Amino acid sequence: MKKLFSIALVALFSCAALAQEFPSRPVRIIAPFPQRGLDVSSEQGSRLRDVSVRDAAVAPVLLAQASVPAEPFPNRALRIIAPFPPGGAADIVARTLSQPLSRAFGQSVIVENRPGANTAIGAEIVARAPADGHTMLIIAPSFTINPFARPKLPYDTFKDFAGVTRVVSNAIVIAVHPSLPVKSVKELVALARARPGELTFGTASILGGQRIAGELFREAVGIKIVNVPYNGGAPATTAAMGGHTSMLVSNVVESAPQVLAGRLRGIAVTSLVRDNVLPDVPSVAESGYPGFEALNWFGAVVRTAPKPLIEKLNAEILRAVELPEVKDQMARQGMSPATMSPADFDAYIRAEAQRNERIIRTLNLKIE
């Protein structure tokens, strides 16, 4: 009897390919004979002999699946979409990461610049890419601004993307023309309150991280100042040096050379602590507004993909950012490592978006 059952069981296993469907309950492989010395009733024996063809047939399928190795990742070239023009900070971040990532993965890493629409053009490319982790997008604060400032985005910021990590961050500088009679946040606030609505602050765009930082500063200190947007950081800096705007709210990379040369006066940085590039310029937080922080940052996201792939990308970017040559390159741009886990970065993106939504709706700001 035992021999007969063994033959039948082997036959069932060999018929796995003929199974019509997967089992609707957990797979069981049951020996229908009691162990020696074990008293089994006829009812129990009947249950033990109830072996379904479907249960037995699926076992070799599962074993075969378990023995097949997972497809390696990445299995082709990686793409990094930088939704900014060549030569800018985001482009530098992408290209600086590309070399160590290429070495780590043994694949080419191609950087593509796709500027336009406040980074929405590049984001759309990634949103439509295969959900396999092979196409990354370098994002900045504008990624968390667009959902509320641009009507009818061709993607869903919070459903179509998954955070990999924040990569680096840098401070934003509040600077004034040397002719303005202020040398501190306290003096700037006093002057602005004495002349409500007269002082202006220039930014690199109508609605980006610098504009948000300027509005957060205005709100925190309780003054009325007017934004003057420019098409880029260079013209905004030039306007401030020429006295066409009262203040400049700009990335430390763009404004630090002018502050160090005395062509602009640094009033404060928006990081929690002083920036290494401008160690003599205090933070807003230490100038009487504890906890104030408004950073410029760059991170990496992919189209929503399996968690193991995202974690692998995260691990390699974290390793890359700690390499001395990468740190040096980032430091030359005034940027410091600011990495996170994928889950923390997703939460950070949502927190930034929630804050930006409040500012945008309060001021009724739009990007047409």
Predicted regions and their residues:
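C-terminal lobe and pocket-closing loops
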Residues: 255-322, 351-354
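Beta->alpha turn/N-cap motifs
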Residues: 138-143, 203, 232-233, 250-255, ...
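A ligand-binding cleft/hinge motif common to bilobed small-molecule-binding domains
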Residues: 143-152, 211, 216-220, 246-281, ...
